[in-house]
C-alpha cells in the first residue's frame, strides 16, 4: 500500500538524498548542485512554483517522490504538469509507489482541468520506459529535447545583456525572472 501526500519541509533531506540516488542511477553522480536551502526555498518559499509529492508505506517510511511543476499548452489553452523527477527507492520498487505517484499527478491534472502530464526519460532506461507504457503513456517519437545550459547558455545569453537590460528582447522577457522553467529544456510545444 502506498500513502501519497504533499511534501513538507521536514522531507527536504529525504528528497535531496533521493535526488542524489537518481543522479547516480542516471550515471551523473557529480551533477547535483542542489542544497537543502535551495530545495526548501523552491518548494516552500513565499510563492512556490515547484511541488513535491511523497510516497510512504503503511509504516510512514518515505519510499519515493515526484517533483513537478506546471507547464502550459498554447494549443489547448490550459496548463499541464511537467514531472521533473519520479523516484522510488530500489528496495520499494514493485510495491506500487511509482504508479500511485503518477496516478496522483494524473488525478491532479484531471481535477484541475489540465491537458496532460508529461516527462522525459533517458532512452537507455528500459525498465522505466516499459513501466510508463504499461500505464498507458506514449513516447513522443516526433519530438527532440533541446537544452541551453552551462557555457552554451552563458555564451548565447551574455551578448544580449547591456547595462542590465535585455536588448532586442520581447517586452515580456523580464517576466522570465523567477518563472517556472523545465531544467531539462523545453521538451514539448503546445
Stretch-by-stretch model annotation:
Residues 16-41:
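Conserved GNAT-fold acetyl-CoA-binding loop/helix
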Residues 41-54, 82:
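A short helix-loop-beta-strand connector motif used in the catalytic cores of GNAT acetyltransferases and
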Residues 99, 103, 111, 123-142, ...:
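Conserved active-site alpha-helix within GNAT-family acetyltransferase domains
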Residues 3-15:
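A short beta-loop-alpha structural element at the N-terminal edge
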Residues 134-135, 144-172, 176-190:
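Terminal substrate-recognition subdomain of acyl/acetyltransferases
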Residues 86-93:
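A short, internal acetyl-CoA/4′-phosphopantetheine-binding micro-motif in the GNAT/acyltransferase core
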Residues 110-120:
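Conserved GNAT acetyl-CoA-binding A-motif
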Residues 54, 61-70, 82:
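Conserved beta-strand in the GNAT
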